[in-house]
């Protein structure tokens, strides 16, 4: 008997499971670490995409994924957080609008506490953020810089809150300080700007996060790395930033610093009435403390915020307790253990002196004195400076200038006449001034008077009537002509024809130079003129011209008879006697003048251009000239302005005055509407 096997019924699900098992058996197994990395890459791509919906969805998922991953068998390491922060960095990069950016910064900062209490992951998350910001800082443009600085401030705030939740654990604070010394506070920082911002905001955010619930010892744990940073950092700008924004900031926010700030603000509002700030004391208002407490209870609490806001919103900054002993110990330890240069040691010793003063209960910073300016006008100050300069100049150069006025022989005789045994450095000027001749002493006094009156621009001196003229003035003075000669020259010039103007200048004027050289001839000429004048009759006929020798001046005035009745002195010698009939007055010029006249007639090889007078102002073709007078370039006092107002009391500005006629021609169209355009009138038009 033949038996048959019953057919086995296999459903579709069982068939699919079998196919998958066969495929899994044929493919090699993938390591779980690679699967985790692939999952991270997928998350990073979603965070850095340009779709805002996808980015927001991934941010919501990321918090849950952090919590699940922290409790799994594959914990986070630093490289994982660096990859994740690469995507979060571009999420913030593409975020737009201030409120949206602030909300995103809050979400990213709140993820510090999203690891289920795993403190190591929280510190690694923050450390990876600071390393990412130091690397990407130079790639941030000016339009995105503010939101990344805001993100840094929020991250620091929420990390300090996380440390506060762990009761300021010393191990956590030490781990936090060591991680910061590897990134933002390293000896060779990658980005100076990021380090400066971190130094600027750290202790402000510590005060906000602590809210008064922190001790001086716990503050010192955060402060110690900054003191070490000041001692070891080579960048002078970072050292100055750490000194002012960390150490000085902690002193200013203390009780002593706030008292000084209040006193200085009051001193400044009063206009610095005293030379020292210690002269101001705080007085009691006179109200009872009970009344103040009642008023404080009645007042409604004002809205406060951790960040400055627009509007009437206050930022409350609690005080951080500062113990100067910790800073002094750390500074002295750094000075003992390290080999610094003289400049670094000088700066550290100055910091030690400041904190020692603060430890004694005195505030060592700020302005303590304000120099008071004496009530002097500018003119008085200028006069004092000029007088001091003149005095100094006289003390230094007075004796030397007086001696330089003398020639070599007189100076030698003057110095020989002085007994130098009685001369010392105190009476040297006095002895020299007494030994000077009176003429030079008079000149020195005159020069001193001129120098002293330069500011007034006038020199007042007494002039004697019979003061003898100097030899130099006598030489420069031209020979005087009597009144009759002047009248004769004037009449002669009136009768002179126009053609004589083209003759050389040497023939038109009297030869004064020859007269100076030959005084005997000049004397003979003068006496001959007087004789001729006496012999002339008193008729009004025109005088006959006398013959002249070649070389005689053509412009010589013709002798004219004097009026009758004029008595002249009798001639004392032959030269004073008048000319007789037939005698002629002959003037023989000097040899030098004859040679000069002969040379002037010879043709010149190089024609001499006539000398042009220097113009005071540039010459233009027009008839009008502008003369710039620098004397008038001065400041006018207010008195001139008041006098001008009295002389012309018209109103300088009249609000009711209409503008004058415009210089522009009116358009032939009265309005801006084109004449060919016909507007449609609506039913509600009122025009």
From Swiss-Prot:
Keyword Transcription regulation attributed: no
Chain spans, region Disordered: 288-312, 463-624
This protein's name: Ribosomal RNA processing protein 1 homolog
Modification Phosphothreonine occurs at: 617, 620
Keywords: Nucleus, Phosphoprotein, rRNA processing
Low complexity bias locations: 554-564
Naturally occurring in which organism (per UniProt): Drosophila melanogaster (Fruit fly)
Positions carrying Phosphoserine: 622
GO annotation, biological process: rRNA processing
Family (UniProt): Belongs to the RRP1 family.
Composition bias type Polar residues, residue spans: 596-608
Disulfide cross-links: none
InterPro entries: RRP1
Cellular compartments annotated: Nucleus
A single GO cellular-component term on record: nucleus
Amino acid composition bias (Acidic residues), ranges on this chain: 288-298
Function field: May be involved in the generation of 28S rRNA.
Positions with biased composition (Basic and acidic residues): 463-488, 497-520, 527-543
């Amino acid at each position: 008997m033949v038996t048959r096997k019953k057919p086995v019924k296999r459903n579709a699900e069982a068939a699919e499971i079998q196919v998958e098992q066969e495929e899994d058996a044929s493919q090699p197994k993938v390591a779980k670490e690679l699967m985790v990395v692939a999952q991270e890459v997928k998350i990073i791509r979603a965070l850095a995409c340009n779709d805002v919906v996808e980015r927001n969805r991934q941010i919501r998922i990321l918090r849950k994924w952090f919590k699940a991953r922290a409790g799994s068998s594959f914990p986070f390491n630093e490289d994982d957080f660096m990859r994740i922060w690469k995507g979060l960095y571009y999420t913030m990069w593409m975020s737009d609008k201030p409120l949206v950016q602030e909300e995103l910064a809050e979400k990213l900062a709140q993820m510090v506490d999203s690891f289920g209490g795993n403190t190591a992951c929280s510190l690694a998350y923050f450390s990876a953020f600071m390393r990412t910001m130091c690397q990407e800082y130079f790639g941030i443009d000016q339009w995105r810089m503010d939101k990344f600085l805001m993100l840094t401030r929020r991250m620091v705030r929420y990390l300090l809150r996380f440390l506060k939740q762990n009761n300021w654990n010393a191990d956590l604070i030490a781990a936090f300080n060591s991680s910061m010394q590897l990134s933002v506070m390293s000896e060779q920082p990658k980005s100076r700007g990021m380090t400066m911002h971190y130094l600027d905001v750290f202790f402000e955010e510590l005060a906000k996060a602590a809210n008064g619930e922190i001790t001086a010892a716990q503050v010192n744990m955060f402060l110690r790395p900054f003191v070490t940073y000041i001692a070891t950092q080579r960048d002078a700008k970072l050292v100055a930033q750490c000194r002012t924004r960390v150490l000085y900031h902690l002193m200013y926010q203390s009780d002593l610093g706030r008292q000084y700030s209040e006193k200085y603000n009051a001193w400044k509002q009063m206009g610095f009435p005293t030379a020292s700030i210690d002269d101001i004391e705080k007085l009691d208002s006179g109200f009872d403390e009970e009344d103040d407490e009642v008023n404080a209870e009645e007042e409604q609490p004002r809205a406060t915020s951790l960040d400055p806001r627009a509007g009437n919103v206050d930022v409350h900054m609690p005080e951080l307790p500062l113990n100067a002993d910790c800073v002094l110990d750390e500074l002295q330890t750094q000075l003992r253990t390290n080999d610094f240069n003289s400049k670094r040691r000088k700066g550290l010793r100055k910091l030690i002196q400041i904190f020692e003063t603060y430890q004694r209960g005195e505030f060592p910073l700020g302005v303590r004195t304000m120099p008071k300016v004496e009530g002097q006008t500018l003119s008085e100050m200028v006069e004092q400076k000029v007088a001091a300069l003149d005095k100094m100049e006289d003390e230094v150069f007075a004796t030397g200038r007086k001696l330089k006025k003398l020639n070599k022989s007189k100076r030698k005789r003057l110095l020989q006449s002085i007994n130098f045994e009685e001369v010392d450095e105190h009476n040297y000027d006095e002895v020299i001034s007494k030994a000077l001749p009176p003429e030079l002493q008079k000149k020195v006094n005159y020069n001193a008077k001129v120098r002293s009156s330069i500011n007034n621009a006038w020199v007042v001196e007494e002039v004697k009537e019979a003061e003898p003229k100097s030899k130099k003035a006598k030489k420069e003075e031209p020979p005087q002509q009597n009144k009759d000669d002047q009248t004769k020259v004037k009449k002669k010039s009136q009768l002179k024809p126009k053609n004589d103007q083209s003759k050389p200048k040497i023939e038109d004027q009297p030869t004064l130079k020859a007269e100076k050289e030959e005084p005997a001839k000049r004397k003979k000429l003068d006496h001959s003129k007087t004789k001729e004048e006496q012999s002339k009759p008193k008729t009004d006929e025109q005088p006959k011209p006398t013959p002249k020798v070649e070389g005689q001046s053509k412009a010589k005035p013709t002798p004219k008879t004097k009026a009758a009745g004029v008595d002249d002195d009798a001639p004392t010698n032959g030269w004073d006697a008048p000319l007789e009939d037939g005698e002629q007055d002959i003037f023989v010029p000097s040899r030098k003048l004859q040679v000069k006249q002969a040379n002037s007639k010879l043709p010149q090889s190089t024609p001499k251009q006539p000398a042009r007078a220097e113009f005071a102002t540039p010459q233009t073709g027009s008839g009008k000239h502008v003369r710039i007078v620098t004397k008038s370039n001065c400041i006018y006092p207010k008195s001139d302005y008041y006098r001008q107002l009295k002389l012309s009391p018209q109103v300088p500005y009249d609000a009711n005055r209409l503008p004058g006629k415009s210089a522009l021609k009116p358009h032939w169209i009265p309005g801006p509407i084109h004449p060919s355009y016909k507007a449609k009138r609506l039913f509600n038009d009122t025009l």
